[in-house]
Amino acid sequence: MKASRLSGLASRSMRKRAGLLGAVVGIAAVGVAAGVVAERTLVRRSKRALDDPYAAEDFGLLPYDEALTVTTADGTDLYVEIVEPIDGVELDAEFVAEVAGTMTTLEPTIVFVHGFCLDMGTFHFQRKELTRRGDYRMVFYDQPGHGRSGRLESGEYELPALGEALKSVLDETVPEGPIVLVGHSMGGMTMMAFAEQHPEYFGDRVVATVLISTSGGRLEETKFGLPALIAKAGSPLLPLVNSATRLSGGVIDRARHASSDLAWLLTRRYGFGDTKPSPALVSYVEEMNSRTSAETVARYLRTLYTHARYPALKALRSAPALVVVGDKDMITPVTHSEEILRHLPDAEFVKVPDSGHVVMLEHADEVNAILIAFLEKLTA
């Protein structure tokens, strides 16, 4: 009798849970259907903005003087573009002697390192303005698995390998002379991995560094603007990392392409700080995101999530450093840049108002002015 009663209670409990689950699923189905209609309407309205300053911008079509392929130690082919200076400037001789010692040339090369799910086009406006000025030799490359570069044959991507890939690019394209490294997001992390492996380059060849919207570690603590209930979890995205690395690219691709409109809205939400950014800019960033294969995305997640290289920043203390971040960055929040400053106490720090993670695109004029002023302090 007692067992029968317990069985009845369990049965009612199960029916109750099933009923609740059914209600949740039903509400979710209605919500999804309504959400799809709403998102498409919102995207159409957003893209029709008549005052978009970048509606006619030729993203991804900037000129270069040389294009080449650099092959890394693990056999990955990297696509590289080089822009030569028109007149060129030299670094201040006393500055170079103090920071790096004797150099065969005082003309610097600026090497740009882009972030996750992006490509060299991330630095579109910096490249455009510096090319117009004609003062600096510049090197741009697509990271492994991104843009026009090749993919790793097997296994997961690792930041130490990205650091070695950067070294391969430097050895091939800047065999001599001073180097200024500029890294955004994962590009900054790549620079840290490079510094961890080759600290001798800093204060010898690398005479200055620029870290934009990046982090030295503890990305697992980032809440990414998630609702408070989810964000209370110590590592809210850990299940995603563990699951994504086991999924096939096809599974993730189907999920990513289920709604390109949703992808556009998410890009605007997480990439930008302004509530009404340029639709053309949002589309450009979303296109770079979508060109990165789902397989590449999954194979990068673990190394980014476990990135911890604050000690590597010690190597960067030997030369001037600039740290830039948008005050509304939800991917690598301001606190991450502030932590970098604790390890680089002499670095310049600029927090750009009303800007998100792609600050160098969203507020290009401000970032260009900041970067050029920093570079001019190094020149004669």
Which residues does each predicted region cover?
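Short beta-strand/loop motif that positions the catalytic acidic residue
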Residues: 316-317, 323-325, 329
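Hydrophobic alpha-helical topogenic segments used for membrane insertion/localization
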Residues: 13-43
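Catalytic active-site module of serine/aspartate enzymes centered on a nucleophile-bearing elbow/loop
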Residues: 2-5, 342-380
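Conserved HGGG/HGGXW glycine-rich cap/lid loop of the alpha/beta-hydrolase fold
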Residues: 74-151, 172
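Flexible "cap/lid" loop of the alpha/beta hydrolase fold
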Residues: 200, 204-251
